[in-house]
Amino acid sequence: MNLKYLLLFFCLVQVLHYCYSHGDPSLSNELDRGLIPKCKLVPEQISFVLSTRENQNGVFLTLDNLSKGGILPKSDLSSIPVIFLIHGFISSANNSNYVDMTKALLEKNDCMVISIDWRDGACTHEFKILKFIGYPNAVKNTRAVGKYIADFTKLLMQKYKVSLANIRLIGHSLGAQIAGFAGKEYQKFKLGKYPEIIGLDPAGPLFKSNDCSERICETDAHYVQIIHTSNNLGTERTLGTVDFYVNNGYNQPGCYLSFLGEACSHTRAVKYFTECIRHECCLIGVPQSKNPQPVSKCTRKECVCIGLNAKTYPKTGSFYVPVESKAPYCNNKGKKI
């Protein structure tokens, strides 16, 4: 990400947040009419890319072709784990970080990975710097994408017998906020809750001061796992059942201490989680305190490992996670808990 664009992005988000939230409607209207990209979200253009061990290149799904049947490998998917993967701002499902995570998930388990591509609503196709100042409109699109995922989930369960117990949502940045909204929308069907939502450094700008109904929240699923890696593009606020603050939640090792480094830290959440899947690297979370205990003294009773098995640990709350600067990032000398 270009440094000058990132600097401008931070400045513009602050200005736009003031205009939209603090009552300067004339300026907001002018911005809406001209400067800010619309980043228009058309539900029909949201695609779901299905990857399996047999077809890792992906099959494009929509609510329309899914409802017609015959598009998925078989009609009874009750025993198959399903993982929704949701990208963030100015990104897409074919971003290399999500492709790497998809491969790691498929190597780990025989599952279906469904990557949600909402690139138009995420401002991905807008012109250069304009895509950055479209952020407020991308934020506005997140709830609609979340509802679409909830509708898609319901159809999967009704038509293909997918078990709710086998569904997990993983989202990065705005994608994490979308996962939270999907959890809220699905609960409106009165069919239960998603078992787990994993938020990888949930987007902070325009969400930090929101209450639970307007951001990812621990009530959105039975278990909500949050990985914090940046405090500007992300947020320091506790959001989930467990909140992991990697390197205290900011300035990740190996990322430069600059605005460009902030983007690096923000993306590290995805890389950390992928390494936890790929290498079964136990990034150990130690209960947060002024003087956190050494990782070497951790036991399963009071510490938790980031990853797909986090919810099998009894402890909840906030955790400090030390990491190394290079993959696989483990800073535990091979310790397992």
Swiss-Prot record:
Source organism phylogeny: Eukaryota, Metazoa, Ecdysozoa, Arthropoda, Hexapoda
CDD domains (alphabetical): Pancreat_lipase_like
Enzyme class, UniProt record, top EC level: hydrolase
Entry keyword Transport: no
Disulfide cross-links: C39-C123, C212-C217, C255-C264, C281-C305, C282-C330, C298-C303
Compartments in which it is found: Secreted
Catalytic activities: a 1,2-diacyl-sn-glycero-3-phosphocholine + H2O = a 2-acyl-sn-glycero-3-phosphocholine + a fatty acid + H(+)
Propeptide: 22-33
Listed transmembrane segments: none
Tissue specificity field: Expressed by the venom gland.
Entry superkingdom: Eukaryota
Protein name: Probable phospholipase A1 magnifin
Keyword match Endoplasmic reticulum: no
